[in-house]
Amino acid sequence: MTEDFSLQELSRLRADFPILGRVGRGGKPIAYLDFSATSQKPVQVIDAISNFYRTSNGAVHRGTHLLGDESTAAFEEGRSILADFIGGRANEIVWTKNATEAINLVALAMRNASLDSAAKPSPVKLAAGDNIVITRAEHHANLVPWQQLCAATGTELRWLDLHEDGRIDCETLGVIDDHTRLVAFTHVSNVTGAVSPVESIVSRARECGALVLLDTCQSSAHMPVDVRELGVDFAVFSSHKMLGPTGIGALWGRGELLSQMPPVLTGGSMIEDVTMESSTFMPAPERFEAGSQPIAQIVGWSAALQYLSGIGMARIAEHERILTSYMLEGISGIDGVRVLGPGADKERIGVVAFAVEGVHPHDVGQVLDSQDIAVRVGHHCAIPLHHFFGVRSSTRASVGPTTTREEIDRFIDALGQVRSYFGGK
């Protein structure tokens, strides 16, 4: 059985994160419970970015000087580091500016292939009568691009529905049929924390000959993720959720699929040859990486992945599982607080959204902030899911590898005061 961190290990871990020493408006150290929105960065990541700019900054794949060669090596090494972390191959990693762009890359490639009458048949080309399937639990980033694709191509958009607690209902898998070309869904909901039944969904998709795209933004920093074991065709990743910098994400795709996808952005760096009349393009992944790339951010993300690997993803998952159960138990003892998501007895991670009776989420967030507890408020880019729960918005607390029981205790204590603060009981 995987062991949780000892108090000494957790203390050493927290010492790597300079921002955890910040004191908030209330005069206490900030209890950061907003890992689902963005993660904090260890000094190893901060130093990697700073050192790159101090010693190695150069353009990638342009020139033969030392700085350019060092930058190119770091840029390409980043592919290998991410590929090793997720169980893929380096030539299957496409750099994007974030996970949203990675999803749009697939959607726009499908659009380009489908609207080009001269395009060769390919697995990403849509035909009359086809459909795309998502779920009601999706972040807007994995909903709106498919709405746009379907509107542009006349394709039907379908979705899997949910149990009352927000988990995907496998009884609705029948919406995936022989005309489904792609099933796109989240590995973990950014509202409920529920882990999706990947095996069941992938199995049904395979029966029907559909491709599968997995959004790992809420899973890849909190549990082991192996794209080949999961059996998907595409997966998207976000650096800033994984202790890395903003401005960099990635698409992983099976090599045989990437090679059949048309480019989305065009320009420098992705061409083989250009004449005044036409152009030819590089093979994947370079075909999808037009223009100058965020090299320093890739260096920082590489350092973050090595940091996570050094801790061990299974250990992080166990630490967060224990804290999630502890948090849910604490919330259950507070009257008037409704958790939007499954209980600790279901497969879930430490993303806990909740509604406080009679109190707006922004007011909840301000009360918590006054006691130096950082949480997220709003609809979390998941309006349809909030409508499913019958609310417009919620407050969300989310844990990470540096979260402590003491921070959870502070959160529960402050949350218990919210309703009385606004005149409730």
List the model feature ranges, each with a label.
Residues M1-K425:
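Pyridoxal 5′-phosphate
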